[in-house]
């Protein structure tokens, strides 16, 4: 079982342990989801600066933080959102069945709560764990953006994956 704790970036209601967990995930795994231009917090007190409005902490049955997910880069308008981009980060102890289970629940939640038609994910080619997770959840590879950003001072390709609403809601 998993739970999603919505974090309002304007009113941070995270425990010191949760802030520390987020900071640890960013330090350990940011190379898989951030480029050379990303703001990396130096300590837990800077974390609120980077949290987008649609950020959730993923908790297990015992309320232990296992990872975080967030949506940004929405396309559409408030009355009719079309798509959003998904970013995830899970601690190593959550890799495997927990991430598969929580990802499927979260994706359906996104389609239900936001009325989205599409969810996108941008992944570095060497991030095989996330690519496999996306495929298990129904995402398909849509394109590869050549030399899209810089990572460690070198041009970096980004693979784009998409998941459409009809995967969860067959017409």
Feature map (PLM): residue ranges:
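Acyl-donor (CoA/ACP) binding surface of acyl/acetyltransferases
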Residues: 1-25, 53-171
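Generic structural signal of hydrophobic/aromatic residues within well-ordered alpha-helices
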Residues: 22, 29, 44-47
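Alpha-helix C-capping/helix-to-loop hinge sites
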Residues: 29-32, 93
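Short, positively charged
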Residues: 31-40, 128
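Active-site rim helix/loop that mediates acceptor-substrate recognition in acyltransferases
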Residues: 36-55
């Amino acid at each position: 079982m998993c739970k999603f704790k919505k974090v309002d970036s304007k009113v941070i209601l995270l425990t010191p342990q949760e802030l520390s967990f987020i900071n640890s995930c960013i330090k350990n795994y940011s190379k898989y989801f951030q480029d050379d231009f990303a703001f990396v917090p130096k300590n837990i007190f800077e974390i609120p600066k980077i949290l987008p409005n649609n950020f959730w902490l993923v908790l297990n049955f015992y309320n232990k933080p296992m990872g975080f997910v967030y949506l940004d880069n929405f396309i559409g308008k408030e009355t009719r959102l079309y798509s959003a981009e998904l970013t995830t980060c899970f601690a190593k102890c959550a890799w495997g069945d927990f991430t598969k289970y929580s990802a499927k629940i979260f994706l359906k939640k996104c389609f239900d709560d936001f009325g989205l038609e599409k969810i996108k994910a941008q992944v570095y080619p060497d991030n095989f764990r996330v690519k496999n997770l996306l495929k298990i959840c129904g995402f398909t590879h849509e394109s590869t953006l050549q030399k899209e950003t810089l990572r460690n001072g070198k041009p970096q390709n980004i693979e784009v994956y998409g998941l459409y609403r009809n995967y969860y809601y067959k017409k």
